[in-house]
Structures are given as structure tokens and as C-alpha cells.
Amino acid sequence: MCIRDSFSPEQKALYQIVYDSQEAAIQAAQAGNSFRSIYQLSYDIVADGLQQLGIIIESSEAKKYYPHGLSHHIGLDVHDPGNYGKLEANMVITIEPGIYIPENSPCDPKWWNIGIRIEDDILITNEGPINLSAGVPRDWKGIETLMKEESALKDFILPEINRLVH
């Protein structure tokens, strides 16, 4: 989530890469496709975007900034164990690409300390993927709009802890 009411140009650029990567991976999350193939698609989009921004030179360098996997099963546990071969109908998985650029990275400092990750829950069906969290704003414009709205918790006051604990 954007911590202010708008993204900086650098945050916006990185967010768009992650968003594009996720959109492509969601569309590729078809029964019969492999977890590996959708990860590779996502990784390639992130690597290409980072190259276009001049953050990396070689696509293999993207791993520094996209150091995690793309997906896991959701079931009885949030990170349910399971077969990570081919996707099958009725599986529920996450698709969550991300980019993290720590301070002192070998790129322009304007990119430092930016972290973007977008996670959605996807139901695999024989007719195609269904995004179970599609009702939440996901693109940067939708998030900026949401961040400018008044919070539903604006006047909410948390009770004092010592009143709750006896």
C-alpha cells in the first residue's frame, strides 16, 4: 500500500512493472500450466522492466530485486504445502510478484528503499483463473484514489490495554 496519498515517479514506475508482471502471471495461471512457467513469465517481465529503467543491465540481475517465489497454495494453512508441478482446477494459489531495492544497491539512489509487492488469491478453474481479491484496488491509480479517501477508522479510538487486561 502506498504510505502517502500518491506514489513518487519512481514508486509508480516500479509498481507498474510489478502490476504488469502480476497481470500476465494471473492470465497464465491456467489448469495444465506449471508453477515454474508462470514464475518465469513474471520474472522476465520484471527483468525487462528493470532493464528499461536502467536499474539492471543483465536479466539475471533481477534476482537481486525479485528474490522470492511467485506463488504458493492456499488451503487450510495460509502457506499450504502442495504439489508445485502443474496447476489443476480447484487449486487456490497466490500470485505475488515483488521488487525490493535496498539502500546501497548498485543503481541510482533514487530507486533505493522502494519495495513493491502485489498479492492476489487466484482460483484455478477449467475456464481460466478467477481473481478472488479482484474487488480491491490494484493498479496505482486505484490505490492513489483510495489513499485520498477519508478512513473509515478516522474517529476510532483504541481502548487502553491495561483496562482490558486484569
Residue map of PLM features:
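Active-site neighborhoods and metal-handling regions in enzymes and metal-associated proteins
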Residues: I3-H166
